[in-house]
Curated annotation (Swiss-Prot):
Gene expressing this chain: smpB
Organism of origin: Bartonella quintana (strain Toulouse)
Pfam families listed in its UniProt record: SmpB
GO terms, molecular function: RNA binding
Keywords: Cytoplasm, RNA-binding
Compartment annotation: Cytoplasm
Keyword Cytoplasm: yes
Protein function: Required for rescue of stalled ribosomes mediated by trans-translation. Binds to transfer-messenger RNA (tmRNA), required for stable association of tmRNA with ribosomes. tmRNA and SmpB together mimic tRNA shape, replacing the anticodon stem-loop with SmpB. tmRNA is encoded by the ssrA gene; the 2 termini fold to resemble tRNA(Ala) and it encodes a 'tag peptide', a short internal open reading frame. During trans-translation Ala-aminoacylated tmRNA acts like a tRNA, entering the A-site of stalled ribosomes, displacing the stalled mRNA.
Family, similarity comment: Belongs to the SmpB family.
Segment forming the signal sequence: none
Main localisation: cytoplasm
Entry GO CC: cytosol
This protein's name: SsrA-binding protein
Amino acid sequence: MNKKRNAPVRKIIADNRKARFNFEILDNLEVGLVLQGAEVKSLRSNHANIAESYASFENGELWLVNSYIPEYTQANRFNHEPRRLRKLLISKREMARFFNATSREGMTLVPLKLYFNERGRAKLEIALARGKKLHDKRETEKKRDWRCEKARLLKRYG
């Protein structure tokens, strides 16, 4: 008998947690990545870092810059450059929308998550973001501390 499939599972490889603290997220989008074979193998073993990376437009295409996917140890001479530029697959309409948005001052494209979708394809969640000022970061930290304190008080007295 066939088993019923459960809810789709997204295997998260890398999460850019600092981006949510350092940037005000305005819009999200899921894009595909153009990868080499050894890069996919390396990602399947959960090795990647997107904390210092960003997306930029060059020659009418969207590229992921400064992402780190380490070399796959069994790939010998067919290995890849760990910090190479990786092309992002995005529709023309979305590309135009994001290009117009990033041409405004202070807007940038930051990666939030790198994961495998239900079909086993490597996907990247990018966000249109605006950098936070120092006082905005302090405000975020105060809100987070208050939420924790409120939960602690409710647990103790409520």
